[in-house]
């Protein structure tokens, strides 16, 4: 283990510092500054190398966290990245974007602040790229089998890389003009700059993975054509159908889904031309939804120069500390101050949106009421209505499932009652040879779950093609996080 008394010597949890707010809202660069090596080493040394490391079960990938904490404490960065890559294809994604359920399961977190696992993880991969320790791993021989992966988000990329490395010829189909899916166009650069995606794609190309951009499966090429052309097809199209709010005034000009705001904004940052971009400069903005997507809209609006930004959440403000009904090692719901919240804006809880109001077809405000709980339901309380002035509203209410994209009509793939592509215990749909991984089959979830499912689905595909597999399968389709709502 690392320092046997490290958790006693260093009791303070010291996370990665953020750049000053007045500086960072003037650009789109990542908000975090580098952490000093000595601080990082001390934080890694707080790991107790538990006999039963609950951080493993908290992470869907089963990351070998105590092992690479120990290696960082011993200044063995090259060995650390080998242990990290053994379970995680893309630690630069999870190290920046994951809410770190592993830290919620850290044994030290029972009576001290948890180990800064996420920060150690991202430092390992950043150091590895800087020192040239990340290299292509092409297969020694080809199997002669072909696989099409549809969608280039975290699940699709993980599945493609795993299948390529065991010798299958893999082609990734992406309807957008660049690879990355959610990572490319859904996540603002201030959370993760896109060079992180680009260099992984280059690694995958050197390993032999092929990429087909600008191809919409279901229209440009049918699912049936893919199934005939390839020995297996993996559906990794994500859960992209946004949850709507069908209340009076929904059709007013100025009410938009969050992704209709974020995707063009990310394209502009990438230097791509965008027509009729939704821009928040000088506008009064209201965001409905208090999750990560809402925070992404908030940070983007700050950088656009919004006059004001208010986030409305229908539920109660979460507690600052773990509630009694969410005991360790479950993943708790906590009040958090993301970088975007630190930059400004107001957050209002127990706010039920009842109507979008406007004049001449344009949004002028949002009518809200206080939320009351009746028979377990959240309802607007009569007599508490008020109108908040607004020029723009962004609906960041989550996603309800995968887009059909012709998959039912063309290959008879079925959907479950939650809007996800149905699959069996081996990630296969009801159509033989067509598999599904990530949010398309699981529903809206975390990037770390998408990568884990991509890896596990790759193992299932490899076994389907070859009769056996050496690929790891960290999760089953029915696995869920340990949580109490």
Predicted regions and their residues:
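Beta1-alpha1 glycine-rich phosphate/pyrophosphate-binding loop at the start
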Residues: 5-33, 62-74, 79-84, 88, ...
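C-terminal catalytic lobe of FAD-dependent flavoproteins
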Residues: 13, 24-38, 42-46, 361-413, ...
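A short, basic/flexible loop-to-alpha-helix module at the beginning of a structural domain
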Residues: 31, 128-147, 263-283
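Local cysteine-cluster metal-coordination motifs and their immediate loop/turn environment
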Residues: 45-67, 89-111
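Feature captures the FAD/FMN-dependent oxidoreductase FAD-binding
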Residues: 79, 141, 146-150, 198-247, ...
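Phosphate-coordination loops involved in phosphoryl transfer and adenosine-cofactor binding
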Residues: 143-146, 214, 281-284, 350, ...
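FAD-site-proximal beta/loop scaffold in flavoenzymes
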Residues: 251-282, 374-444
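A conserved FAD-binding loop/helix module that cradles the flavin
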Residues: 294-299, 304, 440-468
